[in-house]
């Protein structure tokens, strides 16, 4: 397994939208997750400006529904990416349902999305960050990711 430590922004977006659109199997790194979140924000802002401009130019307020099109397009890949991100930290994908608990669920998921990868291979596959390595061979304590003496 070859590991690309820093895939480009375009590679991440292409991977999420083409290869893993509805794939909930395997693992996804923090880098992949946050690059796709950045892409979603950029697209949302651009679409918002375009829709706002068209509404202002044409005066047709009924076009405002177009602002939700990116949300609908990104719903499936975002869901599957969160599931794969949960897998990467050793949590079951069902935890994605925490998003439906107002405020608290979102905070818990945010903490999970910021958590570093589990370095060892788990039930969801090898680590996309560390590869198929045994952390004990690297003298890494997987609990705190610092070298052991």
Name what the model sees in each region.
Residues 31-85, 89-114:
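Hydrophobic alpha-helical transmembrane segments in multi-pass membrane proteins
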Residues 1-39, 78-94, 111-149:
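Membrane-interface extramembranous regions at the lipid-water interface
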């Amino acid at each position: 397994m070859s590991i690309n430590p820093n895939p480009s922004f375009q590679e991440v977006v292409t991977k999420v939208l083409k290869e893993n659109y509805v794939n909930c199997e395997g693992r996804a790194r923090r880098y992949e997750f946050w690059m796709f979140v950045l892409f979603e924000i950029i697209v949302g802002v651009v679409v918002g400006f375009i829709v706002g401009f068209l509404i202002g130019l044409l005066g047709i307020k009924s076009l405002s529904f177009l602002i939700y099109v990116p949300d609908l397009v990104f719903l499936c890949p975002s869901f599957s990416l969160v599931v794969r991100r949960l897998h990467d930290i050793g949590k079951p994908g069902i935890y994605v349902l925490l998003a439906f608990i107002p405020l608290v669920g979102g905070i818990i998921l945010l903490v999970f999305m910021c958590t570093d990868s589990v370095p060892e291979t788990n039930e969801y596959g090898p680590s996309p960050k560390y590869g198929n390595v045994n952390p004990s061979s690297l003298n890494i304590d997987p609990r705190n990711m610092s070298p052991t003496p």
